[in-house]
Amino acid sequence: MKINEFIVVEGRDDTERVKRAVECDTIETNGSAINEQTLEVIRNAQQSRGVIVLTDPDFPGDKIRSTITEHVKGVKHAYIDREKAKNKKGKIGVEHADLIDIKEAIMHVSSPFDEAYESIDKSVLIELGLIVGKDARRRREILSRKLRIGHSNGKQLLKKLNAFGYTEADVRQALEDE
């Protein structure tokens, strides 16, 4: 499968793994402290062919994703579930994911809206047991996996749901199927 967009990954091992899954060009951030030069490369790539961000499903990966989203408008996001990106020793990274899971993530990219869009507020997430309660974390993980928006804490979940334009009905439907 050939991908037109550039795929942004964290490092060389991620590039090697992604290129085994799909035919593509990659941009490596080389860590979570993205410099202006790398951001400029990503901006140029976005203008020419588009960009898909595929970072590790962990804190540094989320930080990279957030920095890119803040500085480069219109990038798409591909997420791999944390459990699918773990090796036998528990280390998390795109380089540990099965090729089929990488391909699947790239085939189901999400694009956030450029403008603030708030169809869901915090009270809905509380009512649905996604923020408060002993089962909230598990319910968030299920919802995040079904909607393909990556691992999220309560605050991040609200931002992601609104950024990707999900409605209260979308969230309720995804949770109904659990």
Model-derived segments and spans:
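TOPRIM fold recognition
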Residues: 2, 20, 24, 32, ...
